[in-house]
């Protein structure tokens, strides 16, 4: 653990030496930057969605690599969401739930991602328009954007909250979120078994979230209660930490027995697993990554007031510690069927690669791959319960998938796998992927995209395939079909 801390400090120091301000925050929009406008280059998934949706700052879903390149050069590639015609809603969401609580909004954003079908054409990711939402606080807007980013959402529209959504002829999909859907998600996510620790602040808590937490804490303190064993952790940026320190909120929380941590978040905290094996949070973003391979900790979700209640009383959800059960996960939608016809198609390469030839076994899915937390960083095995490729290694394959999803940390995970020999021999994306392309470009892994025919549908896992790059064009050919399982 201490070695990882030292390495992290080395990275922060290196950035500082470049003249970069080290805010150590995943919520840059929560310190006055929300008034910015123009072209940005942001590499935090929730911040990308918040910026594009609620401010005048325009950014693609950048990786840390491309954002750093923009900082060094002052230029960002003009593509994707920088182009007005690409900033169009592609999913219509009718909301029929009351949405009165902050956690309701977090649940809604995550729920959208679970409805996506692989047949929907979403080249820039899911970009929903919400109809029927009530007025939203800053915290509600933040919660919606953050959890929608779990599934790669770079931008959203909400009637009466954001700028008006551009009119489109038709949507790729239309879904309705009812009060019943909301109640069912709360039931699915509610704690079963003793809660070991409550974590709030993913993304890092705003001043409003800290005050809401403090209000719930104060109500228990007035009854003479205290939080045992520091069972409540609140994560914040230094900027917001200083603000709650000045207004007395910090003193109240610490007096009650809460821990307030700054410049980090629940996702990257090294938990003592001899003490903490069941977490409770108010955030679907936290739940998404805490239960993933990043942490592998059973995590439940509740409102802030219920989270605080569990922090004070560890008997509210009595019983054995729950376990993560990937076998019970709902299968993610897939449209793949076994293909037998001959197949050859032309696509594009990238300017940093001029010529290569690759032959190998294809590993194919029409479902996006989330590298951070859902591809094992040591083995390269996909570990996402319900994913069509769950349990399958990507090592030495021609990896074919639509695009990367989830965290924009993806290229660093992919680069680590390539360095250690557990990465793919070549990558084919249906849509050009800003999370995959930088790693492939820097480390010379053959990369192709933009094929005339969808390779995620037309190629089977196990097919023998050949790819050739020449003059910027890539030919993809199936040499031999796999047998159907």
Identify the function of each model-found stretch.
Residues 34-44, 81-82, 139-144, 167-171, ...:
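Short acidic, glycine/serine/threonine-rich loops at helix termini
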Residues 218-293, 343-358, 362-473:
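Feature captures the catalytic cores and cofactor-binding loops of soluble hydro-lyases/lyases
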Residues 239, 278-329, 438-440:
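Glycine-rich, small/acidic residue-mixed loop/short-helix segments
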Residues 1-5:
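Conserved small/polar residues in nucleotide/adenosyl-binding loops
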Residues 28-33, 101, 134-137, 203-208, ...:
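Gly/Ser/Thr-rich loops at beta-strand to alpha-helix junctions
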Residues 9, 23-86, 91-108, 357-390, ...:
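Conserved mixed alpha/beta core segments that line enzyme active sites in large multi-domain catalysts
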